[in-house]
Design a protein with these regions (language model features):
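Single conserved hydrophobic/aromatic residue that forms the stacking wall/gate
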Residues: 1-8, 12, 261-271
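Phosphate-interacting basic helix/loop segments used at nucleotide- and nucleic-acid interfaces
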Residues: 256, 260
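Alpha-helical assembly-interface signal, strongest on the long, hydrophobic N-terminal helix that forms
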Residues: 211-215, 219-220, 225-227
Length: 271
């Protein structure tokens, strides 16, 4: 009886796993690849139904990524990056459309993460969202928006990239780096450390969305719940993430989740 029971349990488990939503996370450009590398370290991709991809025009950066799934885009870039020019990042994605179409196939939820303002991520993220959307995936972008100190050109590039994403994404979560300075202790950090705080929020946002769909909790959110929320939304979203334990954990987690709205209003982005 025991072998049969164990075999039946394995069949049920395999069946349940086959019904899990196929989630693909695409880290695009330097910031996106940094995020996807962190997600790998956090073991987000331990299950077969959540897969991560590192996508870049910079061959050296891809070589340093621990992910198995890597895509070097842009023949004319020759693996040397996009030089901070989003039009070159977009051209690289167009040149590598066959490879990108292959990795966006058979996807139910596509999460595209990148830093807005540079070349590869800003230019290629919208194209990847378009390909995923064309093949029937629900698309969510999780991106950062530049600090004011990064200059007008990077903010202009970021607006360009966000507009491309708006055309093809169901929802965009924007993490405004400037808002990080409102968090106690961040304002006095060196700029490199402040960037890492932004990267951490990027990683936590993606993990939060993926784990809501794949991890049991007191209140379960399934794929159709998420689809309903997104379909009736405005395309602009906010996410708050909090975690706590012990007495008062509900209040503590709620306060942590409200520390930073990780998606600003359009006015916040413009400012």
């Amino acid at each position: 009886h025991y072998p049969l029971r164990r075999q039946r349990q394995m069949c049920i488990r395999d069946r349940l796993e086959s019904l899990q939503p196929r989630i693909r996370v695409y880290g695009v450009g330097g910031a996106g690849c940094n995020a996807i590398n962190r997600l790998f370290e956090e073991r987000l991709f331990k299950n077969s139904y959540v897969t991560g991809y590192a996508i870049n025009t910079d061959a050296q950066a891809l070589l340093m990524s621990p992910l198995e799934e890597k895509v070097l885009i842009g023949r004319t870039a020759r693996g040397r990056g996009a030089g901070g020019d989003p039009t070159k990042g977009e051209a690289a994605a167009l040149e590598s459309e066959i490879a990108l179409r292959r990795i966006t196939n058979d996807t139910q939820l596509a999460i595209i993460t990148a830093g807005m303002g540079g070349g590869s991520g800003t230019g290629a993220a919208g194209h990847i969202a378009r390909l995923a959307k064309q093949q029937g995936a629900m698309t969510i972008a999780v991106v950062t928006y530049p600090f004011n100190s990064e200059g007008a050109l990077r903010k202009q590039n970021a607006e360009w990239g966000l507009e491309k994403l708006r055309e093809h994404c169901d929802t965009i979560l924007v993490i405004p780096n400037e808002r990080l300075l409102e968090i106690e202790g961040v304002k006095d950090l060196p700029i490199g450390d402040a960037f890492r705080v932004g990267d951490e929020l990027l990683v936590r946002s993606i993990t939060g969305v993926a784990e809501m769909l794949t991890t049991d909790g007191m209140v379960n959110l399934d794929f159709e719940d998420l689809r309903t929320v997104i379909q009736f939304g405005s395309g602009v979203a906010m996410i708050g993430l909090g975690e706590a334990s012990g007495p008062g954990r509900v209040e503590a987690a709620t306060q942590e989740a409200c520390l930073l709205y990780t998606s600003p209003s359009p006015r916040d982005v413009e400012e």
